[in-house]
């Protein structure tokens, strides 16, 4: 039996040159000996005996397809249903792709949470079922029988606040667990949130996930534009958790209001809305509006963290145990059953803005959960109107230091103000009810007399793409394609403050990577095709580094039942998960994933337009990507 152990993270961070040399090391040993993320020490083992998948599983329908392969529903001999993801090696274009797959497998196999999709375990030995042969990598995963949250919301007029809170708490619990273990997901969206047979959340697709370090920055611009944070769309380095917090705010808005917060009809409008935090003010405000506003803060230093969300009053309303306390209980801690005075005071300090907007319910919540109610703590009924959080006290300083927000002084306005584009509540009618005007869904312009652009009311489910064009949550992340469209480039760790990028001059200097999309750069697919192999060989040795000729038959000629072939597979085992041991950080790698789209006649590709003086930012794209056009297609038809 061959065993390859993962290296422990060194006590001191390696230098940038060491990281570069490590990432550039030739890959020649397949998935078993590919470069590995530096996580907790564990081993990847290969058995000498072979496995025939046809004898082991009964394959049923296809759940989803991606660039690398497909996901099939299958039934094992015990009767248990599983989801089997097959990855064809001839679809893996370069070393970074294989490294990316390796990282996804090891991150998923290391996580152990009830609301995260699990790689299937065999019996009580907790062996991860991953198979590999000369042409395929096969991953056996947990099957979520009720589809994804996208379909669940589509089938219902609107979720009740109770149901929205139920789903949101489970999402927060899983994401909080990831952040505690140093993992950032970076692709949170409805399609990647599955539901099991009991209607519980299962977060899937860790294809764009990575490990992060405090004090260091990532520079991978990835994920869906509709869920992307201002740092992502503007090409700014980020630590990691703050981009998940933004996506969490978008998800909460969808769960509560049934539509997308940002509805730009093109990329420039969308980026402007996201950069200003100008989300659509709902006609019927919810009690969750304060938390949504906190999560959709443009300044990442003022944005709510997962700890803030886990202890927020709206998330824990009606529950005797907070989300953070549930995590402590699951890890073997002994927290109190209810919020005590100390935790309540800490919660008050971090949640002053929601308290100001929902004072009555907060006082009721405090009396309900603190022994003795308001009688034991005098003056707390008015405490929420007097106390300010540290985030709010530092608002003016943060605004001055944040380039993502408009800090220009305006006459007659205080220096302590909300970020530009954060919508104010609509004026009430004489009866005290909020006026529901579908035309007044845009932010009110700051300049007096400036007309408000008329916007037609989008349907509640305008965010949803056609079901036949969507991919499964097991395979929904953008994956490499030959179109040259990339939604993410390489991960780079930057110590200290990010270096400010200067705008290009008109002299035609070389433009560097910035923003979501990039044209034919050193990280683009077209640049890699001439220097990297197009296919991989056997399990233990990949093909030569010289470019290989394309196969004579198209990929579509591969049989639909190719996964059911009589080929023998080697089983790769990962040992038992150790939830009590924190995951170790790792050097991030290049994420070379693109959005596959067939060329359409009569529609000019975005890179055919004149880029002018752009920096390859998302704002320079004259045409939307395929995913965004599909997302808005049904919106325009139904409106």
Swiss-Prot record:
It comes from the Eukaryota. Transmembrane segments: none annotated. The modification Phosphothreonine is found at residue 220. InterPro entries: Kinase-like_dom_sf, Prot_kinase_dom, Protein_kinase_ATP_BS, Ser/Thr_kinase_AS. ATP binds at residues 63-71, 85. The modification Phosphoserine is found at residues 538, 559, 562, 588. The keyword Magnesium applies. The active site is at 187 (proton acceptor). Its cofactor is Mg(2+). The keyword Transferase applies. Its EC number is 2.7.11.1. It catalyses: L-seryl-[protein] + ATP = O-phospho-L-seryl-[protein] + ADP + H(+); L-threonyl-[protein] + ATP = O-phospho-L-threonyl-[protein] + ADP + H(+). It is an enzyme of class 2 (transferase). Activated by phosphorylation on Thr-220. Residues 57-315 form the Protein kinase domain. Residues 529-542 have a biased composition (Polar residues). GO terms for biological process: actin cytoskeleton organization; apoptotic process; cellular response to glucose starvation; negative regulation of apoptotic process; protein localization to nucleus; protein phosphorylation; regulation of hippo signaling. The modification N-acetylmethionine is found at residue 1. Residues 7-21, 472-484, 543-557 have a biased composition (Low complexity). GO terms for molecular function: ATP binding; magnesium ion binding; protein serine kinase activity; protein serine/threonine kinase activity. Keywords: Acetylation, Apoptosis, ATP-binding, Kinase, Magnesium, Metal-binding, Nucleotide-binding, Phosphoprotein, Serine/threonine-protein kinase, Transferase. Stress-activated kinase involved in tolerance to glucose starvation. Induces cell-cell detachment by increasing F-actin conversion to G-actin. Expression is induced by CD95 or TNF-alpha, via NF-kappa-B. Protects cells from CD95-mediated apoptosis and is required for the increased motility and invasiveness of CD95-activated tumor cells. Phosphorylates LATS1 and LATS2. Plays a key role in neural tube closure during embryonic development through LATS2 phosphorylation and regulation of the nuclear localization of YAP1 a critical downstream regulatory target in the Hippo signaling pathway. Belongs to the protein kinase superfamily. CAMK Ser/Thr protein kinase family. SNF1 subfamily. This is NUAK family SNF1-like kinase 2. It comes from Mus musculus (Mouse).
């Amino acid at each position: 039996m061959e065993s390859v152990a993962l290296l422990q993270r060194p006590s001191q961070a390696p230098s940038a040159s060491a990281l570069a040399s490590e990432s550039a090391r030739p890959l020649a040993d397949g998935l078993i000996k590919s470069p590995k993320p530096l996580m907790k020490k564990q081993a990847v083992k290969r058995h000498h005996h072979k496995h025939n998948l046809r004898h082991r599983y009964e394959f049923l329908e296809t759940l989803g397809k991606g660039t690398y392969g497909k996901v099939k529903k299958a039934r094992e001999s015990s009767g248990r249903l599983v989801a089997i993801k097959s990855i064809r090696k001839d679809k893996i274009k370069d070393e970074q792709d294989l490294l990316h797959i390796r990282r996804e497998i090891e991150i998923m196999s290391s996580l152990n949470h009830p609301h995260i999709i699990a790689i299937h375990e065999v019996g009580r030995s907790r062996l991860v079922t991953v198979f590999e042969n000369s042409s395929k990598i096969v991953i056996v995963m947990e099957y979520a029988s009720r589809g994804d949250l996208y379909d669940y919301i589509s089938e219902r007029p609107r979720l009740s606040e109770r149901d929205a809170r139920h789903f949101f708490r489970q999402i927060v619990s899983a994401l909080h667990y990831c952040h505690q273990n140093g993992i950032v997901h970076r692709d949170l969206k409805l399609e990647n949130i599955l539901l099991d047979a009991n209607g519980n959340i299962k977060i899937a697709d860790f294809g764009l996930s990575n490990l992060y370090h405090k004090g260091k920055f990532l520079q991978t611009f990835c994920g869906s534009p509709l869920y992307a944070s201002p740092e992502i769309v503007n090409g700014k380095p980020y630590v990691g958790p703050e981009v998940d917090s933004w996506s969490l705010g978008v998800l909460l808005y969808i769960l509560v209001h049934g539509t997308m917060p940002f509805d730009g009809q093109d990329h420039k409008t969308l980026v402007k809305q996201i950069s200003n935090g100008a989300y659509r003010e709902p006609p019927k405000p919810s009690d969750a509006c304060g938390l949504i506003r906190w999560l959709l803060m443009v300044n990442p230093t003022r944005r709510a963290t997962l700890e803030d969300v886990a202890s927020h009053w709206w998330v824990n309303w009606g529950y005797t145990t907070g989300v953070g306390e549930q995590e402590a209980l699951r890890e073997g801690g002994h927290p109190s059953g209810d919020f005590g005075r100390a935790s309540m005071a800490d919660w008050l300090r971090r949640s002053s803005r929601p308290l100001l907007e929902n004072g009555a319910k907060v006082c009721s919540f405090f009396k309900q959960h603190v022994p003795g109610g308001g009688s034991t703590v005098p003056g707390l009924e008015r405490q929420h109107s007097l106390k300010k959080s540290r985030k709010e006290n530092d608002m003016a300083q943060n605004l001055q230091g944040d380039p993502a927000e408009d800090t220009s002084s305006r006459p007659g306005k205080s220096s302590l103000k909300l970020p530009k584009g954060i919508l104010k509540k609509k004026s009430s009618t004489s009866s005290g009810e909020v006026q529901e005007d579908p035309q007044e869904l845009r932010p009110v312009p700051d300049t007096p007399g400036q007309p408000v652009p008329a916007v037609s009311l989008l349907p509640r489910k305008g965010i949803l793409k056609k079901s036949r064009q969507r991919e499964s949550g097991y395979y929904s992340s953008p994956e490499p394609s030959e179109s040259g469209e990339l939604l993410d480039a390489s991960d780079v760790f930057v110590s200290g403050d990010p270096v400010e990028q200067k705008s290009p001059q008109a002299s035609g200097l070389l433009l560097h990577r910035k923003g979501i999309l990039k044209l034919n750069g050193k990280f683009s697919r077209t640049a890699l095709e001439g220097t990297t192999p197009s296919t991989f060989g056997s399990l233990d040795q990949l093909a030569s580094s010289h470019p290989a000729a394309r196969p004579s038959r198209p990929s579509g000629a591969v049989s639909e039942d190719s996964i059911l072939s009589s080929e023998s597979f080697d089983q790769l085992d990962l040992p038992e998960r150790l939830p009590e041991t924190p995951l170790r950080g790792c050097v991030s790698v290049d994420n070379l994933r693109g959005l596959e789209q067939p060329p359409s006649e009569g529609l000019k590709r975005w890179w055919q337009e004149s880029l002018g003086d752009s920096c390859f930012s998302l704002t320079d794209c004259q045409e939307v990507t395929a995913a965004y056009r599909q997302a808005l297609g049904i919106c325009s038809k139904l409106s």
